[in-house]
């Protein structure tokens, strides 16, 4: 039987302060049962599989290993803020957000790779936090009592408990939340915590679904009450142009803080999920739908072709020479992952893949020993020259250890691991287990071990996606079991086909979850083919970008890497200067791009996002535009399209966005 799916409704399950004792936290554990939403929470459409259920394979495993061998695996050796003197390890050093940020990405990476060395690094942060709670219930270093860094640490502790079953976590969180509920009336949320309240509500809901303690819903309501009204702000969205430093400073007193924080890029990336998260407590359909309006407004006024919105440090318009902060990339991804689970909407997964396969790797070096603070879709130079940032400094698009500011140095590590842990989800319904099943929400080589209808299930996914459109899955239940398997059909994938054991199913509709319900037996094979057709999208001044599947394509400008300084180990800071012209306009029919573009594919290697061997290349006709030049290390605003040029026609080679570090992604279009 084959049909298109609908959303499911979940059921809470009991929670107790039980789990593995301290010291039983290493080695593989059988996947825990899926935890659904407990009444009276409004159910999510899908549920996250317990951490440890998904394992990377193929190129994704290699990418995570590159990360582990890069800065993530050695950060404490080269950066004192998360080194042995960190306040979150009992030292006298940095005691605010950086230790929790680092742990939030290090933990899932360590366990995805089953890497004993990385686990040991993470365990030190966890143990210190669990063993040094304050007598009143507060956690963390005594240097400050700011709510915000605790919000981040709670996210890390929930992951750790799922991965290890450590019996210390739930009582510590319970004591902390009871303390906070009593304290918030005297010491309300402020600054970052006020604007990022939804991240704590996630942890509150996580604990409620395991314990059923009613006070937790009172705490969630208080956090919402004291937090910034993001939904209301977007209902009357005022920030429709590039924010200037002068504009932010126009406000006095408290207005200054709120205006600056409401236009702050990372805050907006985290806020994307506030409607769906709060809808679980409020039960409001309108709250749940708010995510779509927020994304629409950000894309309309600040959208960029790599899937991001501009923010350098604040919202900065649609010019592709504006930047997007790396913290915003990974927080936007996390918001999409959470919003996708709650809403079950395919479009959120489409955008998630666009960020994961373009913006995330596009701002990291191939070996992941260096990153940028800001990346640009039209990035013609990475240097100390003045850039068109709103408030960020001149090092913001350099590649290095701590360009501009250290928040991204601590925070970017969560991007790949959390994406890997979101590839597969679980469906379920409150009334019975008829809808219990597995959901493929994003695609990458992976395998999943879980239980469906009390039957152990192993699914293997083999693919070179996003560089190819074919995906092969092998379903291996321990015994035959009937359940629905949902497969996401991206919105761009018209003409997709699905075969089960060689038999072609009814053609699925793009932008839906295809639902296959059958009795699955060991060795059942699924073949999915997504046509990877070329398509175009329109951006600033009617410029044009080219996409294929989830990948965005760019012209890779010649690069001259000049070392600015050496740090420790393999860490260095780099400027990158152009060695080839970049001011091209494309000559193609935007309505039928395949008629004017030649596509070639090569083998997907161990570094698929590396510059040396892009797995896909496009060849397209172009001409230089003499008046379009650069100034102070940035491309001037794109000329209005269509445009004419008398210069000689050339053939440009375009490659996946992430394989370039100097690039043009939004092109003027030549007049036909």
Model-identified regions with their sequence ranges:
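N-terminal export signals
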Residues: 1-22
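C-terminal beta-rich recognition modules with glycine/proline-rich loops and embedded aromatic residues
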Residues: 26-29, 291, 350-358, 363-474, ...
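Aromatic (Trp/Tyr) and acidic
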Residues: 28-116, 147-163, 198-215, 219, ...
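Extended ligand-binding groove/face enriched in aromatic
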Residues: 88-92, 100, 105, 109-249
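Glycine-rich, acidic and aromatic/proline-enriched surface loops and short helix-turn segments
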Residues: 128, 159, 295-304, 491-492
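Amphipathic alpha-helical segments of tetratricopeptide repeats
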Residues: 130-131, 181-182, 225, 280, ...
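C-terminal beta-strand-rich structural cap/linker in extracellular carbohydrate-active enzymes
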Residues: 483-486, 498, 516-531, 537
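Solvent-exposed beta-strand/loop surfaces of large extracellular or lumenal domains
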Residues: 493-519, 536-541
């Amino acid at each position: 039987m084959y049909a298109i799916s609908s959303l499911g409704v979940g059921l809470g399950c009991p929670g107790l302060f039980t789990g593995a004792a301290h010291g039983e936290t290493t080695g593989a554990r059988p996947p825990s049962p899926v935890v659904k939403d407990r009444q009276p929470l409004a159910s999510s459409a899908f549920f996250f599989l317990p951490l440890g259920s998904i394992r990377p394979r193929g190129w994704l495993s290699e990418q995570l290993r590159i990360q582990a061998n890069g800065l993530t695996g050695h950060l404490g050796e080269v950066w004192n803020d998360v080194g042995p003197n960190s306040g979150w390890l009992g030292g006298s050093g940095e005691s605010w957000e950086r230790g929790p940020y680092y742990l939030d990405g290090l933990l899932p990476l360590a366990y995805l790779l089953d890497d004993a060395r990385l686990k040991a690094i993470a365990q030190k942060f966890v143990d210190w936090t669990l063993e040094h709670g304050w007598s009143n219930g507060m956690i963390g270093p005594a240097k400050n009592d700011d709510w915000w860094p605790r919000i981040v640490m709670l996210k890390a502790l929930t992951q750790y408990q799922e991965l290890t079953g450590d019996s210390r976590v739930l009582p510590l969180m319970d004591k902390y939340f009871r303390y906070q509920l009593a304290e918030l009336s005297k010491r309300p949320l402020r600054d970052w915590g006020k604007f990022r309240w939804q991240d704590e509500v996630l942890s509150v809901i996580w604990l409620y679904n395991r314990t059923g303690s009613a006070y937790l819903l009172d705490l969630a309501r208080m956090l919402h009450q004291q937090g910034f009204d993001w939904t209301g702000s977007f209902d009357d969205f005022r920030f429709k142009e590039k924010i200037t430093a002068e504009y932010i400073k126009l406000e006095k007193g408290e207005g200054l803080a709120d205006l600056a924080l409401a236009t702050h890029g990372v805050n907006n990336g985290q806020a994307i999920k506030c409607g769906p998260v709060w809808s679980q407590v409020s039960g409001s359909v309108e709250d749940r739908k708010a995510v779509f309006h927020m994304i629409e407004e950000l894309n309309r006024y600040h959208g960029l072709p790599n899937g991001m919105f501009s923010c350098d440090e604040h919202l900065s318009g649609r010019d592709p020479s504006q930047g997007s902060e790396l913290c915003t990339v990974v927080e936007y991804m996390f918001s999409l992952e959470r919003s996708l689970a709650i809403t079950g909407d395919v479009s959120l997964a489409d955008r998630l893949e666009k960020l994961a396969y373009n913006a995330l790797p596009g701002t990291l070096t191939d070996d992941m020993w260096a990153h940028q603070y800001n990346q640009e879709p039209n990035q013609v130079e990475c240097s100390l020259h003045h850039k068109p940032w709103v408030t960020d400094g001149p090092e913001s698009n350099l590649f290095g250890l701590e360009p501009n500011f250290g928040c991204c140095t601590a925070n970017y590590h969560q991007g790949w691991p959390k994406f890997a842990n979101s590839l597969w989800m679980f469906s379920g319904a409150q009334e019975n287990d008829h809808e219990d099943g597995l959901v493929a929400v994003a695609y990458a080589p992976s395998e999943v071990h879980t239980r469906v209808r009390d039957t152990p299930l192993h699914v293997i996914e083999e693919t070179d996606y996003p560089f190819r459109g074919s995906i092969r899955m092998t379903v291996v239940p321990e015994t035959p079991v009937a359940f629905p398997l949902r497969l996401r059909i991206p919105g761009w994938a018209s003409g997709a086909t699905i075969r089960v054991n060689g038999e072609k199913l009814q053609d699925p509709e793009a932008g839906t979850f295809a639902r296959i319900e059958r009795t699955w037996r060991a060795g059942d094979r699924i073949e999915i083919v997504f046509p990877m057709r070329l398509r175009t999208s329109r951006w600033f001044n009617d410029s044009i970008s080219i996409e294929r599947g989830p990948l965005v394509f760019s012209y890779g400008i010649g690069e001259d890497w000049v070392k600015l300084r050496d740090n420790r180990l393999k860490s260095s800071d780099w400027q990158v200067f152009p060695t080839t012209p970049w001011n091209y306009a494309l000559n193609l029919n935007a309505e039928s791009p395949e008629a004017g573009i030649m596509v070639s594919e090569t083998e997907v290697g161990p570094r698929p996002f590396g510059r040396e061997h892009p797995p896909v290349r496009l060849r397209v006709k172009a001409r230089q535009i003499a008046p379009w030049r650069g100034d102070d290390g940035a491309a001037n605003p794109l000329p209005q399209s269509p445009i004419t040029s008398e210069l000689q026609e050339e053939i440009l080679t375009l490659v996946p966005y992430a394989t370039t570090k100097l690039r043009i992604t939004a092109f003027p279009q030549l007049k036909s």
